[in-house]
Regions:
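Carbohydrate-interacting/catalytic domains
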Residues: 1-246, 255, 261-268, 491, ...
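Conserved alpha/beta catalytic core and glycan-binding cleft of carbohydrate-active enzymes
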Residues: 389-391, 406-559, 577-634, 638-649, ...
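Soluble or luminal CAZymes and related metallo-dependent hydrolases
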Residues: 258-259, 305-308, 372-377, 421-428, ...
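Alpha-helical packing segments of well-folded alpha/beta enzyme cores
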Residues: 263, 308, 312, 373, ...
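Generic structural signal for small/hydrophobic residues in well-ordered secondary structure
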Residues: 142, 190, 252, 277, ...
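Substrate-binding/active-site clefts of carbohydrate-active enzymes
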Residues: 211-212, 225-226, 231-249, 253-421
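An acidic- and aromatic-residue-enriched active-site/binding cleft used to recognize and process polar
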Residues: 145-147, 155-157, 193-195, 280-282, ...
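Hydrophobic residues within beta-strands of alpha/beta enzymes
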Residues: 50, 150, 275-277, 393-395, ...
Length: 770
């Protein structure tokens, strides 16, 4: 060892490198200028010899520590372009010095990260192939604040955690390193040395790809390497008002399809506006349908590459179909390479061990009190919406986030006020939804929540949580229970059918007959009474009733369904999208009106779906009895023509063909407390939908000259009569008047009561004074 090189050795730092405890390797290794030339140091465990090569010149390095620490002084006053040549037992490798390159993370990044506002963390965290200073490689970044040391390991360094320790940012606990030569497709992990000399190997929380089971290593991927063709769609999405548009969602898993093209063709043919995909993110267990998520930023290897998934989204957009992803910000799985105790300490999970594991699922719950965990989840949501152009997120198990005692009989810790609300989760959801809406106003944010949290879909500005929609679990449970009852007994459970209209406007709802609700078509049919033909009739009736009930729609009939059922669904979606009455006033009381809801003996309900235009009104008649009805009289909203535009019992849908092919003209026969009515055929276990065309007003009589003169003579009388004859009020005005009169009557009664009370009190006072 030369005396000059020896004099430049920082032995305590070299010892930290050799023992795998160095957190600032860029300050020790790599090149630096000295008065005696350029000092270059490197650590190559198991190496036999090492040299620095600059152009055609080779400088042998001196072994400073027998563990494999080498150094050399080369002449010059500027750092040259160089590479290492290292001889191992079986091979000699030439590679660039990772510590000759600076980092990407800045103090501004650190401050945003620590503040919980690092919404684009996905752009720098994880592994990103790039060119730095003209050299191709990959930049790695990970958060492990309590780690003694973090290294990147892979085939490129024989999975040796001593070889490439990462540089720790002083303020945040973020580690980063640019490694020349590492490229897309290379597998890697982080080796984390925790306190107590414990070595952990962890997958990258921000990794964009994984190896399949049983390895689950992270894989370097370039997710920006795709050319999109949906610029028009994305521009329209920013101004999309889903509350005034039809939303019919097809729920499915990519695992059900041989190819993405098949899914695109199916969804387009059936007329859906959106598809909702079970988690496409990586997950551990086959058969779990994607839950829980193990790699949040990676498309599952089961479904192909990131580029293939991007192509699927792009194709769906080009045929006018939006894409919603199931997303799980509530929990993550327990496995050695996952987020649990990532750096040897509770980092992503709740710190209280009693509250960290959910007893129902055995999964870990996120610590929403941590700004850095918020960064991880919010940037993940932004990642799917912005990088993969996804149009919405359906958030799973929101009730498990909102309630501290969800699924727990005991062993839970109340909040600071002694109640069961998870205050940190509430604030996280408000933060998440407000940021996503600010960045992408057209993104759909949907909650799956059954805990009856009030006003979940009201805005964050009103101090609520700010979802666009929530699943209507109450409607689904009540309706499926009603359908499971034999039609003969359904009259005893009629309220299960009508109850939902009492709360249909309390939230912005999506009605679901999804995979969780009914399973496959075979499983759905197994829940229903009757023979196979009756079961299929009730499946058609169920989808039809959902389509005409207030609320957006989501269904999961599966890919392999009978042709007739497919035609029925296609017809329903076509009708739904072309009928403003079925979606335009979903959130308004005036968009729905009962005609008859009390015919429980007959298992029949009748109602109207409306807009502000009478000619767009639809009349809906649902017969949940197993028998048809002939000449069934129904009250109608006005005189005019009524044409059956859909019947779930049509022969083309596999039904009996009990339809009304002729247009019905309303007659002035009172029914259902209405002046006009029609008589129709009702199919058993069927839904009929009628368009309503108001009748023309009667033509005015021709006025004669004599009549005109008479009217002029009696002008004063005519004006007097007109003044005394009030204009006919609309139904809406009449309702408002009645409500106003009722309120006035109630106030008057209350005033009279108060006066009587005061009078009695005065009388008592007078008697007492006497």
């Amino acid at each position: 060892m030369s005396k000059t090189v020896y004099d430049y050795m920082d032995w305590p730092e070299i010892e930290a490198v050799v023992y795998g405890e160095e957190t600032a390797p860029r300050d020790v290794m790599g090149p630096r200028l000295t008065p005696d030339g350029v000092l270059i140091q490197g650590f190559f465990p198991e190496a036999r010899a090492a040299a620095v090569v600059t152009g055609r010149t080779k400088y042998e390095m001196e072994l400073e520590d027998e563990a494999g620490y080498y150094a050399v002084l080369i002449p010059g006053r500027r750092i040259p372009d160089y590479e290492f040549q290292v001889e191992f037992e079986k091979e000699t490798k030439n590679f660039k010095d990772a510590y000759a390159f600076g980092g990407l993370l800045t103090e501004e990044d650190e401050r945003a990260f620590l503040g919980g506002v690092y919404y684009e963390a996905y752009k720098k965290m994880g592994a990103h192939p790039m060119v730095m200073n003209g050299v191709a490689g990959t930049h790695f970044a990970v958060w492990a604040p309590n780690a003694v040391r973090v290294s990147v390991v892979g085939e490129f360094n024989n999975w040796d955690g001593r070889a490439l320790p990462m540089h720790k940012m002083p303020m945040s606990g973020l580690f980063e390193l640019f490694i020349p030569g590492v490229k897309a497709g290379d597998a890697y992990r982080y080796e984390i040395k925790a306190k107590g000399d414990v070595l952990l190997q962890k997958a990258d929380p921000y990794g964009n790809r994984t190896q399949p089971a049983p390895l689950w290593n992270s894989v370097v991927a370039d997710v920006s390497d795709f050319t999109w063709n949906d610029s028009g769609w994305m521009a329209e999405r920013k101004k999309y008002d889903d509350r005034r548009q039809p939303v019919s969602i097809y729920e499915t898993s990519l695992g059900q399809w041989k190819s993405g093209k098949e899914l695109v063709a199916f969804a387009k043919e059936k007329g859906y506006t959106h598809v909702e995909l079970h988690p496409v993110m990586e997950f551990l267990e086959d058969g779990s349908d994607g839950y829980p998520t193990s790699a949040y930023f990676a498309v599952s290897t089961r479904y192909g590459t990131p580029a293939e998934f991007a192509a699927l989204v792009d194709e769906l957009h080009q045929v006018g179909i939006g894409v919603i992803l199931d997303w799980s910000p509530a929990q993550f799985p327990r496995y050695a390479g996952g987020l649990e105790k990532f750096d040897g300490t509770p980092l992503y999970e709740v710190k209280d061990p009693e509250m960290a594991v959910h007893p129902m699922w055995g999964t870990m719950l996120y610590n929403y009190d941590s700004p850095m965990v918020m960064d991880f989840l919010i940037s993940n949501a932004c990642f799917w919406l912005e990088v993969f152009h996804v149009d919405g997120l359906r958030m799973d198990d929101v009730d498990a986030m909102l309630y501290l005692d969800y699924g727990r009989k005991d062993g839970w810790t109340p909040n600071m006020y002694g109640s069961n609300e998870n205050l940190q989760a509430i604030e996280f959801l408000k933060h998440l939804n407000s940021i996503l809406k600010k960045r992408d106003p057209g993104a759909l944010l949907i909650a799956q929540e059954d805990g009856l949290w009030p006003e979940l879909t009201d805005s964050v500005e009103n101090d609520h949580i700010g979802f666009d929609y929530k699943w209507s679990g109450g409607w689904t449970r009540d309706f499926l229970f009603y359908l499971s009852v034999d039609p003969i007994l359904r009259k005893n459970y009629h309220d299960q059918l009508t109850l939902s209209t009492l709360y249909a406007y309390s939230e912005h709802y999506i009605l679901t007959l999804g995979s969780r609700d009914v399973g496959s078509l075979e499983e759905f049919m197994a829940k229903l009474p009757g023979d196979e033909k009756q079961k299929l009739a009730q499946v058609r009736e169920a989808y039809s009733y959902m389509m005409v009930h207030p609320g957006c729609k989501m269904m999961a009939p599966g890919a392999a369904i009978p042709e007739e059922l497919g035609k029925c669904i296609q017809a329903l979606n076509t009708l739904y999208k072309s009928s403003p009455a079925l979606y335009q006033m979903d959130d308004e009381y005036d968009g729905f009106e009962w005609v008859q809801l009390m015919k429980y003996e007959e298992n029949v309900i009748t109602f109207l779906r409306k807009t502000e235009k009478p000619e767009e009104t639809l009349l809906v008649i649902c017969n949940f009895a197993a028998i048809p009805y002939e000449n069934y009289q129904v009250g109608v909203p006005f005189a005019g023509k009524y044409k059956e535009i859909f019947n779930s019992d049509a022969a083309e849908f596999g039904g009996e063909g009990v339809v009304n092919s002729r247009v019905k003209t309303a007659k002035a026969e009172e029914c259902d407390e209405r002046e006009h009515s029609i008589k129709v055929k009702l199919p058993a276990l069927g839904v009929s939908i009628y368009s309503c065309t108001p009748g023309k007003a009667p033509a005015r009589k021709k006025v004669t000259a004599a009549k005109t003169a008479k009217d002029k003579t009696a002008g004063k009388l005519v004006r007097t009569v007109k003044a005394k004859t009030p204009a006919k009020k609309s139904v809406k005005e009449e309702k408002a008047t009645k409500v106003e009169e009722a309120v006035k009557a109630e106030k008057k009664a209350e005033t009279v009561k108060k006066r009587a009370t005061v009078k009695n009190d005065n009388n008592k006072a007078d008697r007492n004074s006497k």
